[in-house]
Amino acid sequence: VDAGLWVIRTSCEYLRNMLDRGIWTTDMQLGVNISPKQFHDPGLIASLEHSLKSYDISPDMLTLEVTENLLIDDFESVVDKMKKIRDMGTRFAIDDFGSGYSSMIYLKRLPLDILKIDREFIANLNSDKDTLGLVEAIMMVSRHYGLDVVAEGVEKREVLEVLRSLGCDKYQGAHFSMPV
């Protein structure tokens, strides 16, 4: 079985198990990393639909996380495919924003729901005013486009406090939990 398809199927199976055990609720989302190769697989949409239906998972419980590297090739076909998946109800996050070929045009043209700020920005937040300014600007632009913002790599309470003061209320990192 292709690893990418296995990840989607296993994620849906995991959600079903957690829902049945009362550990997960239908208003929660699970982020699933999708590689550029997996995204460009012609069978992705059918596999996603099949897995969601097989495990009786609402599409809005999954957030597909893609990186900026996905956008290098054939931007228009990427946008079209993202729109089709989003029309099913599945959400999209751009992961590690700022680490690749960052372009504000992505935020304007892509059907995104979430922007995840790369950990390199977050790690230097307290010690570098330029980084603080960039994070503040990224958050302001994200809000303008109606995107939720997730700060990746939060490892210290001091950084968490700065992020809260900037209006960021979603975080990920060792301060909360190690990756699963």
Task: Name these PLM-found stretches.
Residues 1-77, 153:
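Catalytic core of bacterial c-di-GMP phosphodiesterases, primarily the EAL and HD-GYP domains
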